[in-house]
């Protein structure tokens, strides 16, 4: 029953059914001034899908007389889709879109996420991609606002480094962006972290774009962020304090909850 509920973690705004916003931004002073985040603004067919994502969540928790009515889209653009989790139906398309893109990757995968606690299938997909020669880079905050999540994510770093994945720790501020690009053509921007809560429990909404120009811009942003990050190398990681290893091991049982 718990998996059928889900927290609403989406960050969407739709104005007059003409323009829509989606991404990682919360509303608050700290988020606006102190955090590094990514949101997208959409016009056109994708706005309808963002509105539907809002109405699905609204209708799931309101009675018939209070529900938003469904209306068909005027048109559609196959380059842009909205993947929206629906926990009551156990529908989690964001996770599937990530897996599909990672498994198709031939050249590079660039992921930015504030909390990296993947399930086994997502982790193995990334490891396998790196082992077959794909340039896999994962950027996370050096110190996020959730210390337990930080320590839990570090428990994956050893396997990732061994497989050849580049791990970047962003130092300039708390980076809260949830983005990915694959092979310079596929991109996603949204509210979903690469963790089990976002990919298999929460209400989340991600915009998925298959467009080279958009992906090029996302890669430029990733490169700029990388200039403010430090790369973890294997010798440095293997030389970490023994207490850190103990904490990482103790948090393994909590991974399904994070």
List where the protein language model places each region.
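Charged, low-complexity intrinsically disordered terminal segments
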Residues: 1-258
């Amino acid at each position: 029953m718990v998996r059928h509920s889900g927290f609403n973690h989406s960050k969407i705004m739709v104005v007059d059914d003409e323009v829509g916003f989606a991404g990682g931004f919360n509303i608050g002073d700290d988020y606006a001034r102190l955090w590094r985040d990514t949101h997208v603004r959409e016009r056109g067919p994708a706005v309808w899908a963002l509105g539907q994502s809002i109405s699905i969540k609204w209708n799931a928790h309101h009675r018939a007389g209070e529900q938003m009515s469904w209306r068909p889209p005027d048109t559609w653009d196959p380059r842009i889709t909205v993947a929206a989790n629906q926990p009551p139906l156990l529908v989690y398309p964001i996770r599937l879109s990530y897996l599909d893109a990672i498994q198709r990757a031939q050249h590079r995968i660039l992921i930015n996420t504030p909390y990296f606690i993947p399930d086994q299938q997502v982790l193995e997909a990334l490891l396998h991609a790196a082992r077959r020669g794909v340039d896999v880079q994962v950027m996370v905050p050096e110190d996020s606002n959730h210390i337990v999540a930080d320590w839990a994510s570090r428990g994956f770093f050893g396997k990732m480094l061994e497989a050849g994945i580049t791990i970047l720790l962003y130092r300039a501020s708390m980076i809260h962006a949830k983005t990915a690009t694959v092979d310079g053509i596929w991109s996603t921007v949204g509210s979903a972290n690469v963790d089990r809560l976002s990919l298999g429990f929460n209400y989340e909404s991600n915009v998925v774009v298959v467009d080279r120009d958009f992906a090029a811009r996302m890669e430029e942003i990733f490169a700029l962020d990388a200039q403010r990050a430090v790369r973890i190398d294997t010798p440095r990681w293997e030389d970490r304090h023994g207490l850190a290893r103990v904490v990482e091991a103790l948090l393994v049982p909590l991974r399904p909850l994070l």
